[in-house]
């Protein structure tokens, strides 16, 4: 079953020249977001640019959120990652979806109009309520932190 999410088209090229975000396969977790820029753009090494996607969403359900994640090929092959690492879209946000692109490579990266540059994934949300305690019940891990469980 698919959950309906409200989507507003902010750039008229979405739905005409470029498709609406959609799952590529039945097993896809994310939908591609596109660079809805006005002209070809070059992102210099070390530079971060905020890229419009041409859409806005309203998740509405407080039990859901959306996350904007990088596309693995862009990061691995070209050093293009998200400037904020993960974009979190709260259920009550209704503004435009923007992607912060950071070129962490040492070569300029050219972004063309409509290029797929990130993916949108919907995730369940649990709002926690803290319970103050003086001590925790013991666990196998205890206070073991970074590197505690090893690599093998």
UniProtKB/Swiss-Prot annotation:
Keyword Hydrolase in the entry? The reply is yes
InterPro entries (alphabetical)? dUTPase (IPR008181), dUTPase-like (IPR029054), dUTPase-like_sf (IPR036157), dUTPase_trimeric (IPR033704)
Xref: Gene3D superfamilies: 2.70.40.10
The protein's UniProt keywords, in alphabetical order, are: Hydrolase, Magnesium, Metal-binding, Nucleotide metabolism
Q: Which domain of life is it from?
A: Bacteria
Enzyme's top EC category: hydrolase
Question: Which GO terms fall under molecular function for this chain's record?
Answer: dUTP diphosphatase activity; magnesium ion binding
User: Which CDD domains does the annotation name?
Assistant: trimeric_dUTPase (cd07557)
**Known catalytic reactions:** dUTP + H2O = dUMP + diphosphate + H(+)
Name the pathway: Pyrimidine metabolism; dUMP biosynthesis; dUMP from dCTP (dUTP route): step 2/2
Question: Is this entry keyworded Cell membrane?
Answer: no
Q: Which Pfam families match?
A: dUTPase
Needed cofactors: Mg(2+)
Task: List the PANTHER family hit by this protein, alphabetically.
Answer: DEOXYURIDINE 5'-TRIPHOSPHATE NUCLEOTIDOHYDROLASE
Q: What is this protein called?
A: Deoxyuridine 5'-triphosphate nucleotidohydrolase
Supply the source organism for this entry: Shewanella sp. (strain ANA-3)
Lineage of origin: Bacteria, Pseudomonadati, Pseudomonadota, Gammaproteobacteria, Alteromonadales
